[in-house]
């Protein structure tokens, strides 16, 4: 449901251009006094058992995370159940960024270790576009997209 994805709650490594990693309690839905009452709800294991090299994006009730063997997963934040999985050419690196398109829908931007950069519809998981900015056979993405207005 696109309405559930309307407002990014966390996108990118540091949440904002200053990389503050700060989110006010009202936006996060969690205050310091709540921390002692948190309970474990679910965990996600990857078949390779490898560590994850990406920062997840949290949008509405979904978590978008890249897998160590490739792929981007859209998970229900409350249950951990998958909405969809998008296949990538390689391991997803850097942060998954959210960008609001001109039509009002959210697009995820992510890069992989094989130097591909993807634009993915956040609701359906369908590929909107793909580019390889560097054609060198050893090229790889290890950073994250940044936005200035309509430029990435």
Regions found by a protein language model. Give the residues of each.
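Repeat-blade elements of multi-bladed beta-propeller folds
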Residues: 7-17, 49-73, 90-117, 138-152
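Short intrinsically disordered, low-complexity coil segments enriched in acidic
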Residues: 1-6, 78-80, 151
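Blade/loop signatures of beta-propeller domains
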Residues: 1-40
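Surface loop/turn motifs at the tips and blade-to-blade linkers of beta-strand repeat domains
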Residues: 44-48, 86-88, 132-136
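Short loop/turn segments that connect beta-strands within beta-propeller blades
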Residues: 76-79, 121-124
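A structural motif specific to WD40 beta-propellers
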Residues: 39-41, 81-84, 126-130
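Asp/Glu-centered strand-loop micro-motifs enriched in Gly/Pro and often flanked by an aromatic residue
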Residues: 24-59, 63-64
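A general structural signal for stabilizing positions within well-ordered secondary structure
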Residues: 29-32, 74, 86, 119
């Amino acid at each position: 449901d696109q309405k559930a994805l309307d407002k990014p709650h966390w996108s990118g490594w540091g949440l904002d251009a200053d990389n503050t990693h700060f989110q006010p309690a009202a936006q996060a839905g969690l205050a310091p006094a709540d921390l002692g009452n948190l309970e474990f709800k679910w965990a996600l294991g990857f078949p390779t058992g490898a560590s994850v090299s990406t920062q997840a994006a949290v949008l509405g009730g979904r978590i978008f995370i890249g897998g160590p063997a490739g792929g981007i997963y859209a998970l229900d934040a409350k249950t951990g159940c998958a909405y969809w999985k998008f296949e990538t050419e390689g391991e997803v690196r850097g942060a998954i960024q959210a960008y609001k398109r001109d039509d009002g829908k959210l697009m995820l931007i992510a890069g992989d270790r094989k130097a591909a950069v993807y634009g993915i519809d956040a609701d359906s998981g369908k590929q909107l576009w793909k580019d390889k900015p560097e054609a060198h056979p050893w090229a790889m993405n290890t950073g994250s997209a940044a936005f200035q207005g309509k430029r990435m």
